[in-house]
Amino acid sequence: MPVDINRLTDGWLELESDPGLFTLLLEDFGVKGVQVEEIYDLQKNIEGPVYGFIFLFRWIEERRARRKIVETTEIYVKDEEAVNNIFFAQQVVPNSCATHALLSVLLNCSDIDLGNTLSRLKVHTKGMCPENKGWAIGNTPELACAHNSHAMPQARRRMDRNSGVSTGRFTGEAFHFVSFVPINGHLFELDGLKPFPMDHGPWGEKEAWTDKFRRVMSDRLGISTGEQDIRFNLMAVVPDRRIAITHKLKMLRTNQTIVSAALEKLLKSKRTESRSLETVDKIKKEEESPVKLSSEYSQLLEMNEKDDSSVPMSKELESLVSLNSSSDSVEIIGETEIKKENPPPSPPPSFIGAGTFSPKDLLSLLKNLESEINITEQHLCDENEKRAMFKVDDCRRTHNYDEFICTFLSMLAHQGELGDLVSQHLITNRKPNMGSVQNSGSRGVVRNYNKKTTTNGSSPKTPSSKRRRGRTKYRKRK
């Protein structure tokens, strides 16, 4: 929308309490790695870290009238230096409580990627008083544009009628957003309509700050006493689930590669070992072959002793025999070593040793990794689809259907069908009231019946009317 810097603080529109809307609003602010989730069960533990909570509650007109009265409360933090060192902004711009609640969480966390706009705002408002921080929020064009881009078209028309501070749904009542964040080991409640931030105290050493928050909210909502007001909404600002799922998927795939390589290496070593065992068996069968070769060569030498040309040959054979015998001796030594190193095999246990696995264990582990990878990929797909649906719902929420409806009704009127449709609609609405029409008709019959009763003195169906007619005939005979 076009930005008028002179009237920037006058045009903020009210927003719905929807986690998808708040998540998209974070993206428009330039924040990365953060999303908003709705909390349905306050007593259920929340998985993973939580940056803060956003609480939507009913703001009654009576409370709104008393908001200017500064209450003396023990949980108020009135130290000016302490208040200015945290990001607490008073809401001076109407209908900006949704953005205030988000900024109260984001700008009080040090491990969030705020982006350029919010980083500049955080540096600019450092050390400011709460009122000036509120004006700084209202006069930031990027925040105003992002805020109003997610408002319904009805909010613009409703803004002219309702000039209250927070969002209104009907006369005398509105809904307001506040934030709960952990700051310096204490649970703080940041409400832009209050003059000071509220410190609910530290949490225990062996508990998380979310446990402290649940206790505070249970007491406020009356859950612990059974007097619960169901007209509230609770959302949590958490890290983007897709980042954790993507990291988990990467680790699973890395482990899958490692296990596959280990399994392949183990199978390769098994194949090498089986080949060596086959060689040992072959050596067992050929243990007597050196003796046979020596006898054959000796006979050959005896046959050729008388021949002078057989000498070199004998020398070559001797060398060959010596070579074979030496090689045979080496092979036998190797065989004895193999026999000593490899005793008769025993049934392999599940775990051969510390940190080692059998092929069966590796196959089972690889199967579990593949199953976990499929589940994690489905979770990532679900998160991406949910983020896509956030955008679809936002388009449906912010689209102005007035032009379409007016054009559609004009076309029906031009074709002469609008009157018939309106008549059918009116007849359909009258059908549930047919019982009252019949009752009114029956009351009319009663009125006519009463007239006859008044004229004749009694009902014509009663025995007295018959006697009256009899008396009349008797009088006529006289």
From Swiss-Prot:
Keyword field: Chromatin regulator, Hydrolase, Nucleus, Protease, Thiol protease, Ubl conjugation pathway
PROSITE patterns: UCH_DOMAIN, ULD
Biased composition (Basic residues): 464-478
Region described as Disordered: spans on this chain: 432-478
Site (Transition state stabilizer): 91
GO BP term, example: epigenetic regulation of gene expression
Compartment(s) where it occurs, according to its Swiss-Prot or TrEMBL record: Nucleus
GO CC term (a single one): cytoplasm
Single GO term (MF): chromatin binding
Enzyme Commission code: 3.4.19.12
Main location: nucleus
Domain UCH catalytic: 11-239
Function, as annotated: Catalytic component of the polycomb repressive deubiquitinase (PR-DUB) complex, a complex that specifically mediates deubiquitination of histone H2A monoubiquitinated at 'Lys-119' (H2AK118ub1). Mediates bisymmetric organization of the PR-DUB complex and is involved in association with nucleosomes to mediate deubiquitination. Does not deubiquitinate monoubiquitinated histone H2B. Required to maintain the transcriptionally repressive state of homeotic genes throughout development. The PR-DUB complex has weak or no activity toward 'Lys-48'- and 'Lys-63'-linked polyubiquitin chains.
Family of the protein in this entry: Belongs to the peptidase C12 family. BAP1 subfamily.
Subunit description: Catalytic component of the polycomb repressive deubiquitinase (PR-DUB) complex, at least composed of caly/calypso, Asx and sba (MBD5/6 homolog). The PR-DUB complex associates with nucleosomes to mediate deubiquitination of histone H2AK118ub1 substrates; the association requires the positively charged C-terminal tail of caly, probably due to direct binding of DNA. Interacts (via ULD domain) with Asx (via DEUBAD domain); the interaction produces a stable heterodimer with a composite binding site for ubiquitin.
Name listed for the protein in its UniProt record: Ubiquitin carboxyl-terminal hydrolase calypso
Species assigned in the record: Aedes aegypti (Yellowfever mosquito)
